Amino acid sequence: MANQVNGNAVQLKEEEEPMDTSSVTHTEHYKTLIEAGLPQKVAERLDEIFQTGLVAYVDLDERAIDALREFNEEGALSVLQQFKESDLSHVQNKSAFLCGVMKTYRQREKQGSKVQESTKGPDEAKIKALLERTGYTLDVTTGQRKYGGPPPDSVYSGVQPGIGTEVFVGKIPRDLYEDELVPLFEKAGPIWDLRLMMDPLSGQNRGYAFITFCGKEAAQEAVKLCDSYEIRPGKHLGVCISVANNRLFVGSIPKNKTKENILEEFSKVTEGLVDVILYHQPDDKKKNRGFCFLEYEDHKSAAQARRRLMSGKVKVWGNVVTVEWADPVEEPDPEVMAKVKVLFVRNLATTVTEEILEKSFSEFGKLERVKKLKDYAFVHFEDRGAAVKAMDEMNGKEIEGEEIEIVLAKPPDKKRKERQAARQASRSTAYEDYYYHPPPRMPPPIRGRGRGGGRGGYGYPPDYYGYEDYYDDYYGYDYHDYRGGYEDPYYGYDDGYAVRGRGGGRGGRGAPPPPRGRGAPPPRGRAGYSQRGAPLGPPRGSRGGRGGPAQQQRGRGSRGSRGNRGGNVGGKRKADGYNQPDSKRRQTNNQQNWGSQPIAQQPLQQGGDYSGNYGYNNDNQEFYQDTYGQQWK
């Protein structure tokens, strides 16, 4: 019976083929498809689609044809059938959409899953009615559905909204679409665009979306109005302000380069670069700290620049640079800032002391306290009016030969600390989360007479000399968010180059270096007691190994055995090759398994792709890895 059926199938096809050639004429592009290397049946099927008017030959570029040619005949016919059955009415880039269908097919094939034909999509009648009512456009790709962007001129004719106008919407039912989301959120204010992320494998949404409003007030109103809103029985939305990241952290920058040098050089290899944030060494204003932040006009430009710089094919000043997403700045609530009585003072000379600051600022009002950290300080006033007056009059003035900058201090980010605590609780290692907020710069290692020494030496334990906890506990302000929210956590970036010793093993990352030089006197005090400040490294009596637990000092003692070779040697920039260099913020000590830890704003495709990264050659879908509520994953 099977042979008979198969025979009939072949016979029917043989009967149909002459009918096709006689009754339906091939388009002028059929021969081109054959010459491009497509199998005859595949070329005929694609030519049939051209004749239906769903897509024109000019809509498909060379990359789409090349990708289709790589499929076997059965797979190519299946892809074209799915493409033909898809609703292309809102698809503006049909070539990209076809590539997305091919990518989805391969993923299903790899997973051994079949196309879910029963999956319910959006109600096209309701979608059409929504678009007719609002005048917005809808652009559909395999990875997202984009409503608006820009909106009609009758709604908003200004420039594209900036930071603080976007919200993240989580916990969306998977079969819910624009016809239900838009009427709810447009109550908060005019919408610039709505991006509903789609899962090509299931055909449904991914459970979250990004909505950009035409103003900050509308975005804040959307959070108040729609957070915890029951959009369906038992289904409550989660809504919060989202920050689209358009800033990159770049390491391995020559320290003699100026802001203008960096802007010019990176503008040659990336597009959309609008600013460079560069910080100088406190003791030498002519040198930078070995890193900078590149700010791009939008997240799309930043994502493209990041991929390009990480490829290893692009070199800056002859070297491959380290590139990561920078932690985005989250602006505090205006109502909270209106109560701040603390000033953040930066660009202080090394000779400036707390006493000098107290004398300079006390003339504006009574001070509660002054705390100087490195080349910046916090000045606490008892009265807000005095703080504002001091800021207005002292900003830009010179103290000890340096022009200072003053802004109101930002209160601590409680949500970030909660996230840090959650990550810390789930981690077995004793080290805190370096990858999100590395510790401040540490004092130089002890200069003594002990032999040995290490190289690398920039990964200090966070509890060592840590002003973060001290300052948060006693002062209540989070200094990580100052200088644009980026500089302070990376202050110690270039420390690794300074630690070099004679003899001894090569140290691994992640712990303070042992004392360097030749010999060191034993600490004062009674024999048998630990030296105070033991985390600084092993005292006399051991050699070589780094970062181990504190050892007790027993009088003068005898010299210990030679330490083992340390872990990865850090701090040296690779001169050539295509491997992305290790970032000094990303510790990779093998013993601690740090290399597997996430880094701030790392694209989400490695731990679960929330970005809808299925677009045309990955270029259309990767740009929305915004910061959003982690609790709604």
Swiss-Prot record:
The cellular component terms of Gene Ontology attached to this UniProt record, alphabetical and capped at eight, are:
catalytic step 2 spliceosome; endoplasmic reticulum; nucleoplasm; nucleus; ribonucleoprotein complex; spliceosomal complex
From which organism does this entry originate? Homo sapiens
Residues bearing PTM N-acetylalanine: 2
* Location (main, coarse): nucleus
Q: What is this protein called?
A: Heterogeneous nuclear ribonucleoprotein R
Where can this protein be found? Nucleus; Microsome; Nucleus, Nucleoplasm; Cytoplasm
Polar residues: compositionally biased ranges? 588-604, 622-633
According to the record, the residues making up region (RNA-binding RGG-box) are: 447-567
